[in-house]
Amino acid sequence: MSGEAPRVAVDPFACPMMTMQRKPEVHDAFREAGPVVEVNAPAGGPAWFITDDALSRYVLADPRLVKDPDLAPAAWRGVVDGLDIPVPELRPFTLIAVDGEAHRRLHRIHAPAFNPRRLAERTDRIAAIAGRLLTELADASGRSGEPAELIGGFAYHFPLLVICELLGVPVTVPMAREAVSVLKALASAAQSGGGDGTDPAGGVPDTSALESLLLEAVHSARRNDTPTMTRVLYEHTQAEFGSVSDNQLVYMITGIIFAGHERTGSFLGFLLAEVLAGRLAADADEDAVSRFVEEAVRYHPPVPYTLWRFAATEVTIGGVRLPPGAPVLVDIEGTNTDGRHHDAPHAFHPDRPSWRRLTFGDGPHYCIGEQLAQLESRTMIGVLRSRFPEARLAVPYDELRWCRNGAQTARLTELPVWLR
């Protein structure tokens, strides 16, 4: 027998400023209400949240709940992030917005590029990128007498430069400092079928320089057998589809770059804060560092909720009937801090025995970049500890502030640090 979900009055999409030791009360309110709760969506109409760990994993594997943006409410078009529909040429190559066999096909293409052994072989290059960025910040801090700011100066630039290095996209450090807005403009243009990447009236940044570098990486992958990620993608896309255009390859690697730096950058900011607050023992070995990273993954998910899913047909989830097209989110942060699965769930304890978390998702859309994010995290910690053993926060830990940017990103506002 099915019924209606309880309605919760709290706003899960609000973006209050919070301290590092405070988690939004919305998650507790959700759990108290039930495993499926109904809320008012910011763009209008109802939406449903899944708050229970086991039910969340069931939902993330349920083929009736899909990521097809065509099923989103019409009023959400142009209002809700991530629901733009790519032009027909590019749509089959959208890993995060296709399901079933189409998704399995794309996963087969992407998985070899993210092979853990292949990634581990690039550890030295990843460490070199981290070391160069941190050294530049330390030198600038020494000249100015002001602390280095690691959110704007490192947390996002580091994973951006790493993923570009792996893809064979020759992005320089100065370009990385402007690349976030450029990448957003590129993604928007690709999904709308827009023109040359510029919009003088709207102030959209010129994307031509970065687009040229992406094309350069694609052309190089076609000509050379150097095993960059782009080359691996090219080979496996050819095998799956028979052919692939330059535009399609550029679209795929643009998606990888954007996903590979934005959320990783958000997480690295939180991870750095925990390390620099002295929570990682000075003599921590590799296993202890790995446990520390895993606890940070649980405690500081860079996204509070999953991407939107929509009911392809009428479904009953947790005893609640959802109509066709029903928008559904899984409460990642809430399940990660559920006392039924974790002792002292709102405390940061690197030695806790259970690493159960939903930060990287579950089911077919489990994050393919998890191994890279973990490698970047461990490598960054190693470089920081070896080159700047006396690095510390420039402000008390309790004064750090973080906020959400809508439903899909949580990030520190700034992270001032003395690099010594």
From Swiss-Prot:
InterPro entries: Cyt_P450, Cyt_P450_B, Cyt_P450_CS, Cyt_P450_sf. Heme binds at residue 367. Its EC number is 1.14.13.181. It is found in: Cytoplasm. Its main location: cytoplasm. Its cofactor is heme. GO terms for biological process: daunorubicin biosynthetic process; doxorubicin metabolic process. One of its GO terms (cellular component) is cytoplasm. The keyword Nucleotide-binding does not apply. Keywords: Antibiotic biosynthesis, Cytoplasm, Heme, Iron, Metal-binding, Monooxygenase, NADP, Oxidoreductase. It comes from the Bacteria. It catalyses: 13-deoxydaunorubicin + NADPH + O2 + H(+) = 13-dihydrodaunorubicin + NADP(+) + H2O; 13-dihydrodaunorubicin + NADPH + O2 + H(+) = daunorubicin + NADP(+) + 2 H2O; 13-deoxycarminomycin + NADPH + O2 + H(+) = 13-dihydrocarminomycin + NADP(+) + H2O; 13-dihydrocarminomycin + NADPH + O2 + H(+) = carminomycin + NADP(+) + 2 H2O. Pathway: Antibiotic biosynthesis; daunorubicin biosynthesis; Antibiotic biosynthesis; carminomycin biosynthesis; Antibiotic biosynthesis; doxorubicin biosynthesis. It is an enzyme of class 1 (oxidoreductase). PROSITE patterns: CYTOCHROME_P450. One of its GO terms (molecular function) is heme binding. The keyword Flavoprotein does not apply. Belongs to the cytochrome P450 family. S.peucetius subsp. caesius ATCC 27952, a mutant strain derived from S.peucetius ATCC 29050, is the only organism reported to produce doxorubicin in vivo. Monomer. Involved in the biosynthesis of the anthracyclines carminomycin, daunorubicin (daunomycin) and doxorubicin (adriamycin) which are aromatic polyketide antibiotics that exhibit high cytotoxicity and are widely applied in the chemotherapy of a variety of cancers. This is Cytochrome P-450 monooxygenase DoxA. It comes from Streptomyces peucetius subsp. caesius. The lineage of its organism: Bacteria, Bacillati, Actinomycetota, Actinomycetes, Kitasatosporales. The gene is doxA.
